[in-house]
């Protein structure tokens, strides 16, 4: 409610009017992009906007749509994150960026080899794997350059010179290089192709201007759970300044602005272990000044948004006997790696390396409902689905006169048509069978396949 959408639209239009940008682009979540286009059109009824529909990005229409962007002088091009990911990027630029990443990995490997006995095999193996992955990506790009045809329009040819990224935290998983592969909490250094694709696009614009310009990130959760996310913001938006400060990788940045400590923590099996983490920022005034150069920060209080106070209630639900039994098995599995304890085949060599991830995945599913692990488990009156259905029914009766509507979310066990047991369908079953709520009054958003159906 702080006005991000309108700010994006006004900023894009004013940049065009003042010749600060010739062809700006706005990208947003699929669920929000139609609202962004409508807001822009309402603010500027005479603006020439190109809004990408799902039909425009079908295989048959995509090439024509890309040529449309290239050959026309639009005030703004608006599309979703997913659609943006389908735009080809300049192979030559990809080659340069991937080669720079590979050079950094090779430098790190050389440093580790010189350290000799002080380096673990796991650390060396991690960097060698990263080197292999980058070499494979480079080969793929080199092949794309050799086999390229003239009819492919890439992002560079489209002439986009400023990009506004709504909900930019969706692209936070960008690749980075580090020798600290055993330090907890750094995230996945390999990153995602989605984030790498965004880096290619931003670098295309920055190379054209020769400045740290051309991209605006908008988000309510810029940094959520890792200090690497702050470094990656600078990697996206301030490459020239990082280079000026001779910061060419995460380790160089962390050496200046972060402090690593070793503390004792409880692990998954409830044992105390030593954990190495970057726990503190240092040189905070300098880091804050660096961050403020690229940031405009607003809270709902700053803007004066009138919002109701959140009434958050945490319900503590004790585990069922089956869950308590499974927790003990899970702890034994985490210690021994004996997968038969969980009713599955022994772990392969690859699975053995990911043992703790497997344990965490089982723990998440078990905490929601034992039937997430095996549908043959019995229902239990004290599981979360039962408690949830009971509370929904109570609110249903309480606000029946007002025809109140409730939203129910779960990050696991979402509804999939014809896909066996899931917690959404189980809650609906309990509401209809145990509490007499008409089935027609409980709907799944997943049943709505179009924007029109969702709004209805």
Please describe what each predicted stretch is.
Residues 15-21, 237-242:
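Post-Walker A helix-loop "phosphate-sensing" segment adjacent to the P-loop in P-loop NTPases
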Residues 51-62, 81-86, 411-413, 441-454:
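Conserved helicase motor
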Residues 1-12, 16-20, 305-456:
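Conserved Helicase C-terminal RecA-like lobe
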Residues 89-97, 178-190, 276-277, 414-423, ...:
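Short, flexible/disordered intra-domain loops and linkers
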Residues 7-10, 20-43, 48-49, 56, ...:
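Conserved Walker A/P-loop ATP-binding site and its immediately adjacent core
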Residues 62-107, 121-125, 129-162, 170-172, ...:
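Inter-lobe coupling linker of SF2 helicases/translocases
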Residues 95-121, 176-191:
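A solvent-exposed, charged loop/short amphipathic helix patch at secondary-structure junctions
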């Amino acid at each position: 409610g702080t006005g991000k959408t309108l700010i994006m639209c006004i900023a894009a239009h004013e940049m065009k009017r003042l010749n600060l940008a010739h062809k700006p682009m706005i990208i947003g979540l699929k669920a929000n992009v139609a609202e962004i286009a409508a807001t822009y059109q309402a603010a500027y009824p005479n603006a020439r906007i190109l809004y990408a529909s799902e039909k425009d990005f079908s295989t048959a229409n995509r090439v024509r749509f890309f040529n449309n962007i290239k050959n026309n002088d639009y005030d703004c091009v608006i599309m979703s994150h997913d659609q943006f990911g389908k735009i080809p990027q300049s192979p030559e630029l990809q080659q340069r960026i991937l080669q720079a990443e590979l050079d950094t990995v090779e430098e790190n490997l050389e440093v580790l080899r010189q350290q000799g006995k002080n380096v673990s095999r796991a650390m060396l193996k991690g960097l060698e794997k990263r080197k292999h992955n980058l070499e494979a990506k480079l080969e793929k790009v080199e092949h794309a350059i050799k086999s390229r045809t003239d009819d492919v329009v890439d992002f560079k040819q489209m002439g986009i010179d400023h990009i506004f990224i709504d909900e930019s935290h969706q692209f936070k998983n960008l690749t980075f290089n580090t020798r600290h592969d055993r330090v907890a909490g750094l995230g996945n250094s390999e990153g995602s192709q989605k984030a790498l694709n965004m880096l290619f696009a931003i670098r295309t614009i920055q190379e054209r201007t020769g400045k740290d310009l051309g991209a605006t990130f908008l988000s309510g959760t810029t940094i959520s759970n890792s200090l690497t996310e702050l470094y990656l913001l600078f990697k996206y938006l301030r490459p020239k300044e990082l280079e000026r400060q001779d910061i060419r990788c995460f380790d160089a940045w962390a050496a200046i602005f972060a402090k690593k400590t070793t503390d004792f923590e409880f692990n998954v099996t409830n044992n105390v272990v030593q954990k190495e983490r970057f726990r503190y920022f240092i040189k905070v005034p300098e880091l804050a000044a660096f961050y403020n150069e690229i940031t405009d920060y607003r809270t709902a209080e700053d803007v004066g948004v009138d919002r109701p106070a959140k009434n958050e209630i945490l319900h503590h639900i004790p585990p069922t006997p089956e869950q308590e039994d499974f927790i003990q098995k899970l702890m034994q599995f985490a210690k021994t790696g004996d997968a038969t304890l969980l009713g599955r085949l022994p772990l392969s060599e690859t699975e053995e390396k990911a043992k703790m991830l497997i344990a965490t995945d089982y723990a998440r599913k078990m905490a929601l409902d034992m039937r997430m692990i095996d549908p043959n488990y019995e229902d239990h009156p004290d599981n979360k689905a039962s408690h949830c259905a009971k509370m929904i029914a109570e609110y249903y009766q309480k606000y029946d006169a007002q025809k109140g509507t409730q939203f129910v979310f779960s990050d696991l066990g979402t509804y999939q048509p014809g896909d066996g047991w899931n917690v959404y369908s189980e809650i609906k079953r309990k509401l209809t069978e145990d509490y007499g709520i008409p089935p027609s009054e409980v709907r799944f958003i997943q049943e709505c396949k179009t924007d029109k159906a969702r709004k209805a």
